[in-house]
Each structure stands twice: as C-alpha cells, then as structure tokens.
Curated annotation (Swiss-Prot):
Subunit structure: Homodimer.
Family matches, as InterPro entries: aa-tRNA-synt_IIb, aa-tRNA-synth_II, aa-tRNA-synth_II/BPL/LPL, Anticodon-bd, Anticodon-bd_dom_sf, Pro-tRNA-ligase_IIa, Pro-tRNA-synth_IIa_bac-type, Pro-tRNA-Synthase_IIa_type1
Record-listed E.C. numbers: 6.1.1.15
Family in the record: Belongs to the class-II aminoacyl-tRNA synthetase family. ProS type 1 subfamily.
Gene Ontology cellular-component annotations: cytosol
Protein name per its UniProtKB record: Proline--tRNA ligase
Gene Ontology terms: biological process: prolyl-tRNA aminoacylation
Function: Catalyzes the attachment of proline to tRNA(Pro) in a two-step reaction: proline is first activated by ATP to form Pro-AMP and then transferred to the acceptor end of tRNA(Pro). As ProRS can inadvertently accommodate and process non-cognate amino acids such as alanine and cysteine, to avoid such errors it has two additional distinct editing activities against alanine. One activity is designated as 'pretransfer' editing and involves the tRNA(Pro)-independent hydrolysis of activated Ala-AMP.
Xref: HAMAP family: Pro_tRNA_synth_type1 (MF_01569)
Subcellular location: Cytoplasm
Single GO molecular function: proline-tRNA ligase activity
Length: 589
C-alpha cells in the first residue's frame, strides 16, 4: 500500500502539547498518531491506528499459535456477575457504572473474568471439553483518578485478555507455561527491552503471578533485580528474607525517658545521642520503631484505623500498601480530627502500647518483618515528649500480624538468601499473567464432570497484554532526540519516501519507486507534498519514525538515491537502478 502525505489525515506539530509529561505522549501527539479527546481518552489517527493494529496482529498470531481461540464480549456488562464475585464492591470508584432507562445497573468492562467464566459454564460440562484457552482484544474502561502520561495511564485502553480453563492444577501449569512462552515471543517481536518479574495478583486473585515490564525511566512500576541470581520482582511483591529471632534473656528492662520536642525520627536520634550516648556506636534511625497510622476506607463504606510499625529508617511505600489493601481501598495518614477522636494516640510519640485491635483505640497494628522477636527498639511512650528505650519485640509488645509495605532500597538483601543484594529500576507494565486457580469458578459455580463422573471445579489462568499501552512503551524505549524510531515489526510503514525540490523528474522517480515497492508488498509512506520545503519533510520523516527513509532529490542527477536508517542514522547512496532491490533486502532482512 502507498500512503501519500498530501492526502493522509495527519498534522505534525513543532511544539510539545502542554499536558505532555513523558516523551511518548509528546511525540505521539506531535507526530500525528493520537489526539486527546478528554483526560485519559485518546483518538487514534491513521498512523497511530496502523501501529496499534500491527501490535494486535503480533499478539493474535502468537495466541493462535498456542491454540487459543479469539472471541469478543460486549463492553457494556451487567452488574450481577460482578456482584457474585464481590468485585462490584471491590472496584469502588475505579469503574464506570451506569443504569439503563429501567434502572438496571451496568458497568463498562474493566476486565472480563466473570464473563469468560460464565460463557464456559453455559457451554461446557465435561473434562473432555478441556483444556480450553480463549481470548479477546477489546477496549476496557477504568475511572482512573489521575489519568496521566498519555496512553500509559488512561481511562480507555485496548487490552488482550485471555483465559485458560483446566480440570486440575497440573493442567493449569501447562496452560500457564504456554502463555508465558507466547508472551516472550510477543515481546521479543515487538522490539523493546523488557524484564519478567514476580508480581502480586491484586484484585484478580489467585496464586502465581508474573509481570512483563518494559524498561523505562518514566515507568510507574518499580521493580528489583538481584545482583547475583536471576531473582526479579515488582517492588509490591518483594518479601524480606527471614530473620531469626534474637535471644533476649539478658536484655535490659524497657524504660521510659523524657524526650522533649522529638516528634520526628531525626530529632529523636539527635536527642538520644546527646542525652543517652552509647559506647559501642551512636544511635541511628534504624534503632527506632516508627508507628505510622492510616485511616483506611473500604469500598463497602467501612472505615478502619491501621498502624504500621517499621524501623525508623524506612518509609511506608504507598504503592505497596495499596497493593496489600486491595482494589478500591483508599487510605490517608491520620489527620488532626483522627487524633482528636482517639486521645490515647499521642501524635509524634505513638508506641505499641496504644496499638492493637483489642486496645481502647481499636487500631489494627501490623509489624514489618524486620521487627522480629527479641529485637530492641526505641519508640513512643504514648505521651508527648516521652519515648521508651529497650522495648523488646515479643517480650514487651506484639502486633496483630505482619505486613510488607516498607520501601525497598538498593542494597537490600535478596529474598533468596544467596548473598546477593537488590537494585531497583523503573518499568512500564506491559503484560500480567496469573494462575487464578478456582476463585472465579467457585464464585460462579463453574464445574465439569471428571473421568470418574464426579463434579469438579475448573481451575483458571488469566493473561493480559495492553496493545495501546504497548504503543507508548515502544515509543518510550526507541525514540531519540529527533522523534520516534519504530521497530520494523510495528512501524506504520516499511519505507518513508521523501521527494525533495521542485523538479518533475524527482517526483516522477519517487512515484515510480513507490509503485515498484508497493508491487513487492512493501508498505510505503510517500511524502509527495509539492509545496513543502525539504527541511520540513526531513523533520517530519525523523519525527514520524518509519525505519527506512529514502530521499529522492539532487543525487538523482548523478544516478544515486539516499537510503537512511532511522534508528542508527546511517546513510548510503544507492544507484537508482538498484534502489528497489536494496530497499526490499533491507525490509526483509
């Protein structure tokens, strides 16, 4: 096919859009791939739609190759299936809800586990029907509170979601591995750097879960890698290596001390070193126990107070806490009104003595795993200007449970205990695969008869990829200072022909080259605009980012045509009579 710039519905921009936060957003708008319709909602222009469709086709080919079958569900979904799994409530404000004229409740589909489960339940009843893998590529909707970064965090997005159905866990393992292998092939073909990391299941439920992250400094996801082994995990899924209990038979008794004007860890440590110096080493923030209290609002309207106890040199990671609390839960640190309602909590001096579900304040108290039995701490004495020294975990206090929400830092030990340390990096979530198990099958009563004629609950896997997000992720990973630079597999065209000058022979030669390439199945973007300067055409070619640029211009008089590699910048002058063969060889290499 030949796309002509003179008639193509595109308008390139020289200035960055005012709301662009990341390079992919800026360049996709400037190059005429997408246009903003509303916050988090974008229109796909012809060039952008071509890239999106190519990504979808790569996904489709690899899904078909493992025997998955494509289908399509509606985007407008009834309330009842989501009530059965409790996700109508769990999603909270995160979904778009609406009613028809009769008052019946619906939602715009954020994900389709329930619908896939029900259609299989309607049609299949025997183990002989399984295993089964089915998928769709469809638009999803989520009411993001803060849509940002263009296509990376939107309210409307395209997603491929597939589901496997097996009669037992061994079958699920096989289906999961097939999908995982297919995802590796998909991301290898899409042409950007990625990493596979352990992940949390979140609202999806289930057990084993992995994410495919595009490496990107602008990514919203933080992940860690071990410096020695192959361990990699989303920061939300990182677990601290087990710490053995510390003997405390000889530990001194806990004692309260006056520590005026020390409501922060920094002021407390300074006071300790001034008033209670130690011979072996100075006091440090890691010697203190920080107790951070949150007001937690659940989607069903319930509110609770939650305290997290962690070493004073660590902060609570909001994303880790969000992942722990679940979909639709909103939280914020205790405010003045919250403290006023619980007078036993002394702001800046909160200690374990006032915390716990059975204490008067009724605050659920969860401890970081580093607060192991026998460890000694300095922490609040539940009175202004006072702290307790030598408070021993397990002897003097305990929590209602454990929670892993402290920030993960470079240099932390690898959870595998191999002596390696963790290093952090940023990425964009491109794919997420889950072993759902029987969560949705149980909720929706999906059962089949096994070989013995006994009803058994089907076990499921869920596998998602975001094609629209992939457009942005690829742009993030491959752009340069001049513009986009697409991998050939997903580029809107194979070749961008630029005819320069006003010579009719130049345009005639460019036209002939375009047709000859088209006959050979090469996709051509042809800049045939007669009244546009060469400089503007060159800038547009660099901005649009087609992988091979052919410049037909002044070299034609000498019998040569320039061929440029967009990603490397390498140029070569090719004899005009060999040009088509050379370009075809480049495209098909």
């Amino acid at each position: 096919m030949i796309m002509r710039m003179s008639s193509l519905f595109v308008r390139t921009l020289r200035e960055d859009p005012a709301d662009a936060e990341v390079p992919s957003h800026r360049l996709l708008v400037r190059a005429g791939y997408i246009r903003r319709a509303a916050p988090g909602i974008y229109t796909w222009l012809p060039l952008g739609l071509r890239v999106l469709r190519k990504i979808e086709n790569v996904i489709r080919e690899e899904m078909d190759a493992i025997g998955a079958q494509e289908m399509l569900f509606p985007a407008l979904l009834p309330r009842e299936p989501y009530e059965a799994t409790n996700r109508w409530t769990e999603y909270g404000d995160g979904i778009f809800r609406l009613q028809d004229r009769k008052g019946a409740d619906y939602l715009l589909g954020p994900t389709h586990e329930e619908m896939f489960t029900l259609v299989v339940k309607d049609l299949y009843s025997s183990y002989k029907d399984l295993p089964l893998s089915i998928y769709q590529i469809q638009t999803k909707y989520r009411d993001e509170a803060r849509p940002r970064a263009g296509l990376l965090r939107g309210r409307e997005f395209v997603m491929k979601d597939s589901y496997s159905f097996d009669v037992d866990d061994a079958g699920l393992d096989v289906s999961y591995q097939k999908h995982r292998d297919a995802y590796v092939r998909i991301f290898d073909r899409l042409g950007f750097e990625y990493v596979i990391v352990e992940a949390m299941s979140g609202a999806m439920g289930g057990s084993k879960s992995e994410e495919f992250l595009a490496k990107a400094s602008v990514g919203e996801d933080t992940y860690v890698r071990c410096t020695l082994c192959d361990y990699a995990a989303n920061v939300e899924a990182v677990h601290s290596p087990p710490i053995p209990p510390v003997p405390y038979d000889d530990a001194p008794a806990a004692h309260a001390e006056q520590t005026p004007d020390t409501p922060t860890i920094e002021t407390l440590v300074a006071h300790l070193n001034e008033r209670f110096p130690r011979e072996d080493r100075p006091w440090a923030a890691s010697d203190t126990l920080k107790n951070v209290v949150f007001s937690v609002h659940h989607p069903d309207g319930a509110t609770e107070a939650l305290a997290v106890g962690l070493p004073g040199d660590r902060e609570v990671d909001a994303k880790r806490l969000e992942a722990h609390l679940g979909e639709g839960v909103v939280f914020e640190p205790f405010g003045e009104a919250d403290f006023a309602a619980r007078p036993t909590l002394a702001k800046g001096y909160i200690g374990p003595g006032a915390l716990g579900e059975k204490k008067p304040a009724g605050v659920r108290y969860l401890l970081d795993p580093r607060v192991v039995e026998g460890t000694r701490w300095v922490t609040g004495a539940d009175a202004a200007g006072s702290h307790v020294i030598d408070l021993v975990a397990g002897r003097d206090f305990s929590g209602d449970g454990l929670i892993e929400v402290a920030e993960v830092r470079d240099g932390d030990p690898c959870p595998r205990g191999d002596g390696g340390t963790l290093e952090t990096a940023r990425g964009i979530e491109m794919g997420h695969i889950f072993q759902l198990g029987r969560k949705y099958a149980d909720a929706l009563d999906l059962k089949v008869l096994d070989e013995q004629g006994k009803l058994v609950t089907v076990t499921m896997g869920s596998y998602g990829i975001g094609p629209s997000r992939a457009v942005a992720a690829i742009a993030e990973g491959t752009h340069d200072e001049l513009g986009l630079a697409w991998p050939r597999e997903v580029a809107p065209a194979d070749v961008h022909i630029v005819a320069t000058g006003k010579d009719e022979h130049v345009f005639a030669a460019a036209e002939r080259i375009a047709h000859e390439l088209d006959k050979q199945g090469v996709e051509v973007l042809y800049d045939d605009r007669p009244k546009v300067s060469p400089g503007v055409k060159f800038k547009d070619a660099e901005l649009i980012g087609v992988p091979t640029i052919v410049v037909v211009g002044k070299g034609l008089a000498a019998g040569t045509i320039e061929v440029k590699d967009r990603r490397t910048g390498q140029r070569q002058d090719v004899p005009a009579d060999h040009l088509v063969d050379r370009v075809i060889a480049i495209v098909r290499a």
